[in-house]
Amino acid sequence: MMIRIGFGYDVHPLVEGRKLIIGGVEIPFTKGLLGHSDADVLYHAIADAFLGSLALGDIGQLFPDNDERYRGIDSGLLLQEVYRRVRERGYCLNNLDAVIVAQKPKLLPFIQKMRENLAVLLNTAIENISVKATTTEGLGFAGREEGIAAYAVITVKEVLENG
């Protein structure tokens, strides 16, 4: 059985007048993430990790920010399309480990719901999904509350025809 690894990263600036959506969860906060879609930084990092695992490019190539079809789109739909392409090539998720980097808001109360959302979107057991959050101890753009970043590492495994 072939196992492949993918790594993804995404970042979006925090701005007033936008909803903060991370991992498909709307989080009460005074600012939201700016982007062409709903700017779900976690879903974007995971999508890039999936694409990287099979050398399929990145989400910017697949869903360009100058394409009006994707303006304001739910990033869960983008992630589902990416995962459909992974499955189409004979692979499925083995394990996902992600970390969100944000000084504020505190994300711990929302992590379990993010994991549940991902388990449903990716049709896998929640035990295969790890999501964590951390701060930068006040350092850098995240520490200054200018933006939020996410990193994701995944392994995908080849789906065997008879087993």
Swiss-Prot record:
<feature type="binding site">
    <location>
        <position position="12"/>
    </location>
    <ligand>
        <name>a divalent metal cation</name>
    </ligand>
</feature>
<comment type="function">
    <text>Involved in the biosynthesis of isopentenyl diphosphate (IPP) and dimethylallyl diphosphate (DMAPP), two major building blocks of isoprenoid compounds. Catalyzes the conversion of 4-diphosphocytidyl-2-C-methyl-D-erythritol 2-phosphate (CDP-ME2P) to 2-C-methyl-D-erythritol 2,4-cyclodiphosphate (ME-CPP) with a corresponding release of cytidine 5-monophosphate (CMP).</text>
</comment>
<protein>
    <recommendedName>
        <fullName>2-C-methyl-D-erythritol 2,4-cyclodiphosphate synthase</fullName>
        <ecNumber>4.6.1.12</ecNumber>
    </recommendedName>
</protein>
<keyword id="KW-0456">Lyase</keyword>
<feature type="binding site">
    <location>
        <begin position="36"/>
        <end position="37"/>
    </location>
    <ligand>
        <name>4-CDP-2-C-methyl-D-erythritol 2-phosphate</name>
    </ligand>
</feature>
<keyword id="KW-0479">Metal-binding</keyword>
<dbReference type="GO" id="GO:0046872">
    <property type="term" value="F:metal ion binding"/>
</dbReference>
<feature type="site" description="Transition state stabilizer">
    <location>
        <position position="135"/>
    </location>
</feature>
<feature type="binding site">
    <location>
        <position position="144"/>
    </location>
    <ligand>
        <name>4-CDP-2-C-methyl-D-erythritol 2-phosphate</name>
    </ligand>
</feature>
<dbReference type="InterPro" id="IPR020555">
    <property type="entry name" value="MECDP_synthase_CS"/>
</dbReference>
<feature type="binding site">
    <location>
        <begin position="134"/>
        <end position="137"/>
    </location>
    <ligand>
        <name>4-CDP-2-C-methyl-D-erythritol 2-phosphate</name>
    </ligand>
</feature>
<comment type="similarity">
    <text>Belongs to the IspF family.</text>
</comment>
<feature type="binding site">
    <location>
        <position position="141"/>
    </location>
    <ligand>
        <name>4-CDP-2-C-methyl-D-erythritol 2-phosphate</name>
    </ligand>
</feature>
<keyword id="KW-0414">Isoprene biosynthesis</keyword>
<feature type="binding site">
    <location>
        <begin position="63"/>
        <end position="67"/>
    </location>
    <ligand>
        <name>4-CDP-2-C-methyl-D-erythritol 2-phosphate</name>
    </ligand>
</feature>
<feature type="binding site">
    <location>
        <begin position="58"/>
        <end position="60"/>
    </location>
    <ligand>
        <name>4-CDP-2-C-methyl-D-erythritol 2-phosphate</name>
    </ligand>
</feature>
<dbReference type="GO" id="GO:0008685">
    <property type="term" value="F:2-C-methyl-D-erythritol 2,4-cyclodiphosphate synthase activity"/>
</dbReference>
<comment type="subunit">
    <text>Homotrimer.</text>
</comment>
<dbReference type="Pfam" id="PF02542">
    <property type="entry name" value="YgbB"/>
</dbReference>
<dbReference type="GO" id="GO:0016114">
    <property type="term" value="P:terpenoid biosynthetic process"/>
</dbReference>
<dbReference type="GO" id="GO:0019288">
    <property type="term" value="P:isopentenyl diphosphate biosynthetic process, methylerythritol 4-phosphate pathway"/>
</dbReference>
<feature type="site" description="Transition state stabilizer">
    <location>
        <position position="36"/>
    </location>
</feature>
<feature type="binding site">
    <location>
        <begin position="10"/>
        <end position="12"/>
    </location>
    <ligand>
        <name>4-CDP-2-C-methyl-D-erythritol 2-phosphate</name>
    </ligand>
</feature>
<feature type="binding site">
    <location>
        <position position="44"/>
    </location>
    <ligand>
        <name>a divalent metal cation</name>
    </ligand>
</feature>
<dbReference type="InterPro" id="IPR036571">
    <property type="entry name" value="MECDP_synthase_sf"/>
</dbReference>
<feature type="binding site">
    <location>
        <position position="10"/>
    </location>
    <ligand>
        <name>a divalent metal cation</name>
    </ligand>
</feature>
<dbReference type="InterPro" id="IPR003526">
    <property type="entry name" value="MECDP_synthase"/>
</dbReference>
<comment type="pathway">
    <text>Isoprenoid biosynthesis; isopentenyl diphosphate biosynthesis via DXP pathway; isopentenyl diphosphate from 1-deoxy-D-xylulose 5-phosphate: step 4/6.</text>
</comment>
